[in-house]
Amino acid sequence: MQSSIPLKQSHYHLFKGLKVLKSSHPEVRKIKRQQSGHSAHGNKVWRSSFVILDYLETHPLQENSCALEIGCGWGLAGLYLRKFQNISVKGIDIDPSVQPYFELQNTINGCEIDFEACSFESLSQQTLSEYQYLIGTDICFWDELTQPLFDLIQKARTAGVKKILIADPGRPPFWALAELCAEKLGSEVITRRIDKPWKSEKYILVIT
């Protein structure tokens, strides 16, 4: 699928082969004007998304597998996996207003990925059993999210999910989650740095 949407170079970052739209793009600005608000901070691309793309380039997932991107926002991680690693992907986000951004970002990059507006707490073990990978970026930003995310991780492991990746700039709720996972599940946290499109250092919780 080829995009017919006009795209000036000043309106996107080119990163790991993806065109990542900036807020200055006319279609992005149009969506923002049409919407009244965002309930869960989904109206921008968070920098942890770029760092997890860098990680996925170095540590590719198994081809022809399935991944679920939780709290997907504009869906960059899933888009990268679909476009470059032949992974079947679905994105979910509690905020339905991110869907136009998600679809625009996919169209610009010539992909189609399913989106569903739902919370990660609503995911059943049966649903999780359809995926080998679970990915999230900047999803642990409130204290009250730590325990539900830990419960989801445990449920996903029971369902047979092979690998879980959660990227974050290092907020206290993320470290609380990482501590829980290290104690109960033997996880690790990786520090990852990128130099472009900005210098940035983030952390990735890896659970296998």
Residue spans for each PLM region:
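S-adenosylmethionine-dependent methyltransferases
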Residues: 1-208
